[in-house]
């Protein structure tokens, strides 16, 4: 039963390392991208386009 704690610790390390590097990359990229308003408009236009091209099953 000594294997379980070791597996758990290795899983934690494997999960935490990519999460930390991703957070650092995200914070670094946030300085470069335009203000949030433009970014939200971009996401909204993408969502509306998806809604038109993929109607929900009830609208057939």
Swiss-Prot record:
UniProt KW Signal keyword: yes
Basic and acidic residues bias (residue ranges): 36-54
Entry annotated with the keyword Secreted: yes
Tissue expression pattern: Expressed by the venom gland.
Record key words, sorted: Amidation, Antimicrobial, Cleavage on pair of basic residues, Secreted, Signal
Subcellular localization, as worded in the UniProt entry: Secreted
Residues bearing the modification Arginine amide: 36
Coiled coil: none
UniProt signal peptide: 1-23
Region (Disordered): 36-60
Residue stretch(es) of the prosequence: 37-60
Job description of the protein: Probable antimicrobial peptide. Has no inhibitory activity against herpes simplex virus type 1 (HSV-1).
Family: Belongs to the non-disulfide-bridged peptide (NDBP) superfamily.
This protein's name: Antimicrobial peptide Eval151
Species, as recorded: Euscorpiops validus
Lineage, uppermost ranks: Eukaryota, Metazoa, Ecdysozoa, Arthropoda, Chelicerata
């Amino acid at each position: 039963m000594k294997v379980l704690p070791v597996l758990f610790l290795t899983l934690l390390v494997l999960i935490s390392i990519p999460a930390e590097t991703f957070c650092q990359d995200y914070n670094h990229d946030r300085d470069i991208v335009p203000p949030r308003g433009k970014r939200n408009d971009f996401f909204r236009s993408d969502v509306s386009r998806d809604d038109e091209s993929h109607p929900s099953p009830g609208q057939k």
